Design a protein with these regions (language model features):
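Short, glycine-biased loop/turn motifs at secondary-structure junctions and
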Residues: 1-156, 167-185
Length: 185
């Protein structure tokens, strides 16, 4: 699959369309496409079907999902420029098949670890990161059973982290209630 099916006019057309949506203030967060307005994906394809990116633009759907998620995150001003930045960064004819694994590797090994405190969570990030590293180095997606094992371990780490966070919040509620009752006594 080649980006824009190796046709620069496809890129020019979508950039013009996205610019028109931005200038008309039709880029909005929270829904795909409704009444002539939508999110990054919605204004690009006038639907929420990320798979259309593959057929219409030669862009893997996982990148459309990532574009979508990133659009919803920042403040409105920079978010409205994001669809043009995203589509504008893609060279017609580019093979984008390794962009997702490279992004995921960066995210798991460079960006997220700085926010992780628990050893089990760090181990889960490392395990999944190792699979993405292998994918990036060999250009071959590791076998499904290896992803499933990593997913299971990551899910267990996430559940443990969520339980710990919930316990922490519960103790905060316990403390608040106790203070309330002490003050009322």
């Amino acid at each position: 699959m080649l980006a824009y099916h190796n046709d620069p006019t496809q890129k020019d057309a979508i950039l013009a369309k996205l610019s028109a949506h931005r200038l008309a203030d039709e880029l909005v967060k929270g829904h795909y496409w409704e009444n002539g307005k939508g999110c990054a994906v919605g204004c690009t394809i006038e639907s929420g079907n990320h798979a259309e990116y593959e057929h219409r633009f030669g862009i893997p759907r996982i990148l459309a999902r990532l574009e979508d998620r990133i659009f919803e995150g920042p403040p409105n001003g920079s978010a409205k420029e994001w669809p043009e930045q995203f589509m504008g960064a893609i060279r017609p004819g580019a093979d984008l098949s390794m962009v997702w694994p490279r992004f995921a590797l960066w995210l798991l090994t460079e960006e997220l670890p700085q926010f992780v405190k628990k050893k089990t969570t760090k181990a889960a990030l490392s395990e999944v990161g190792a699979l993405y590293r292998e994918w990036c180095e060999t250009a071959k997606n590791p076998e499904a059973h290896r992803w499933m094992k990593a997913r299971k371990n990551a899910s267990a780490a996430a559940a443990a982290a969520a339980a710990a966070a919930a316990r922490g919040k519960a103790y905060q509620r316990f403390a608040a209630k106790l203070v309330e009752l002490l003050e009322a006594a």
